[in-house]
Amino acid sequence: MLKLMRMAVVVSAAASISLAAGVSGNYIEARTADVFTGPCFANGEVEMNGKEAVFGWKITGGSWQGVSLEGLSVVGVIRSVHTLGNVYEPVNPVRAVLIVDSRADAEQRLALQSFARHMGGTLLGDIVQVDYAPIELTIQDGNIHGGAAKLTAGSLAAIQTRAMQATDHTCGNEEVWYPPLTELDHAMPAYALADSYQGDGLGETWSNGPRRSGFLGTFHVASE
């Protein structure tokens, strides 16, 4: 019995160490094209819309490269040459702006940038500007399935979403046409009531919505 108890303590401690060696949290995304749609709408938008996106992560627990990021957020804003997710344009140059939570200290700011580059991959491979602003990401009742969420990154970027509704089905054969821009444990399409970017890093600004262009999700990733 004592041996079993000791084993349980060891397993529990190992699990705690494993969890602490990474970060987990919530994610939000909105683009300038529908992501939940049917072929009739998707084909009409491809290469016309969907070249811009705002997305953000809020870390609810854990550390990255040994630095605690709990409660902090980071936002990516991108502009691409082709529609994001267009499989017929596998080479798609992207310029990006990173918005780092201004509440973070110097060490945390560097860790947030590293985390975002890891999660964003090639989408954040050409970051032309890094800004700092207070970031808030709230998901109503902490439930991504409810669909109601809001992201603000100072006055630079914002997203507001609600749940998808039956009236949002236009063709009747809608599906998740484009996957989220980052790897997630779980994701739900959401209706973006509004999303915007008002910064000066990409040479243009936009204010978009309402449209079926959002995602909410959760993530857990091991630290580098």
Regions found by a protein language model. Give the residues of each.
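Mature, soluble, non-transmembrane domains
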Residues: 99-221
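N-terminal Sec/ER secretory leader and immediately downstream segment
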Residues: 21-100
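Bacterial N-terminal signal peptides
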Residues: 7-16
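Positively charged n-region of N-terminal signal peptides that target proteins for export
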Residues: 1-6
